[in-house]
Amino acid sequence: LVYRITGRYVILKRKPRQYTISGFVRDSASYESLIAATVVERSSGKGSVSNNYGFYSITLSPGKVVLSSSYVGYEPCSVTFELTCDTMIDLSLSPAGVLGEVVIKGISPRSDVLNSRVGVSDVPASRVKSLPALLGETDVVKTLQRLPGVTGGTEGMSGLFVRGGDGDDNLFLLDGNPVYHTDHVLGFFSAFNPDAVKNATFYKGSFPAEYGGRLSSVVDVRTNEGNRKEYHGNISIGLLAARANLEGPIIKDRSSFNVSVRRTWMELITWPLMTAVNKKADTEWKGGYHFYDMNAKVDYSFTDRS
């Protein structure tokens, strides 16, 4: 309640009721969620930032609302409506036109002060696939090994040693679920298929309160939800392994899937070695080591009725 004292009287007023606007911020082309998109109501100045699932929420007083959303690399979007009850509105942003490369050089005298996320690195999937890798096999963990304060030990291994810590001092999460065994083939491959990864957030210090149980670092890996508009697929063949990825809508603009599989053919490399060894050995040795894995994800947006 809101009250006001006038002489000997206390006048009570009912506090104006407020309503909540919530929804998801998505890419209009692929319908994937946009993380850390800005949503602002222009007249009041109140705003919010979308979370890891693209969800936002703002509480406002009833009346005319001008809701604006923006995200790096996308055209801003605005919606005007009358707020009379709790409302759910999804905002779709269109990718902005890409201009030619422009190089801007400058020196910030207080760059260390302006950056509030000390010890945090965001690694998108495009960066993982663009960096050179041993024998052409791209990998999230090997990309993190190139960051300052991180070493990977032996060349080709997928472990992380952050700021002098041990390999067991790191917390790996896949869509919020802990991953305890993070490598294959004695550490030559990590357990994260690059075709399934959307982005990875790497914390070297000042961990958020939601993470715990580790001393050195936290690696939060998020996987692709899949394209809700059209079907896409790709096949990649390397020296040591082959990968395939397929994504697309189950119900258009409502649900999607993303499936990624990979398999190595290291037995083709070890077979000549085993043949040479068996010619000189009394006992026949057999070696056909390989591995395969699969990542599958289904994303569905529920409504008030389903």
Model-assigned labels for residue ranges:
Residues V2-R4, K46-V49, E75, V103-D168, ...:
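Periplasmic N-terminal accessory/gating domains of Gram-negative outer-membrane beta-barrel systems
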Residues I5-R14, Q18-R42, S70-Y74, T84-P132, ...:
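Short, acidic, small-residue-rich periplasmic hinge/interaction motif at the N-terminus
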Residues T6-G7, S43, C85, T154-G156, ...:
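Residue-level recognition of beta-strand termini and adjacent short loop/turns
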Residues S43-F55:
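Short, acidic Ser/Thr/Gly-rich low-complexity loop/linker segments typical of extracellular
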Residues F55-T59, D90-S92:
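Exposed aromatic-hydrophobic patches
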Residues S61-G63:
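A glycine-anchored, Pro-Gly-centered beta-turn/N-cap motif
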Residues V65-L67:
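A short tyrosine-centered beta-strand micro-motif
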Residues L171, N199-E210, S216-N224, H232-A281, ...:
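Predominantly transmembrane beta-strands of Gram-negative outer membrane beta-barrel pores used
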